[in-house]
Amino acid sequence: MDQLIQLVEATQAGVETPDIYPGDSVRIQLRVIEGEKERLQAFDGVVISDRGAGTNKTITVRKISHGVGVERIIPINSPNVESVTVLKHGKARRSKLFYLRKRTGKAALKVKERKVAEKAS
């Protein structure tokens, strides 16, 4: 069984994902299938939690839509995830930002911004 898991993880090893941390504002392009049609749907929000590592990594993203808080748990290596873009790097002092659930309005999305040096390519 361990060999099978290692084989699957080895096939996913080449997939490049950006460094995502709690507090980051992200845009995730999800592939949505409705009937016979397929389209991309963007989900913008703040990462309030990350869990797992490697191919099992998931993030919980929260956004406010029409005054209602919406959270999605998204597996990063899912075939339905087209792309993950980090819009802003947030500065968080906790690994889980569940306290954002109690906040309303703009305060629900406010996290201090973290300055990140660009990687030389």
From Swiss-Prot:
Superkingdom in the source lineage: Bacteria
Pfam families: Ribosomal_L19
Example of a GO cellular component annotation carried by this entry: cytosolic large ribosomal subunit
UniProt key word Ribosomal protein: yes
An annotated Gene Ontology molecular function: structural constituent of ribosome
Keyword Transmembrane: no
Keyword entries, A-Z: Ribonucleoprotein, Ribosomal protein
GO biological processes: translation
SUPFAM superfamilies, per database record: Translation proteins SH3-like domain
Task of the protein: This protein is located at the 30S-50S ribosomal subunit interface and may play a role in the structure and function of the aminoacyl-tRNA binding site.
UniProt record similarity statement: Belongs to the bacterial ribosomal protein bL19 family.
Protein name per UniProt: Large ribosomal subunit protein bL19
Organism, scientific name: Chlorobium phaeovibrioides (strain DSM 265 / 1930) (Prosthecochloris vibrioformis (strain DSM 265))
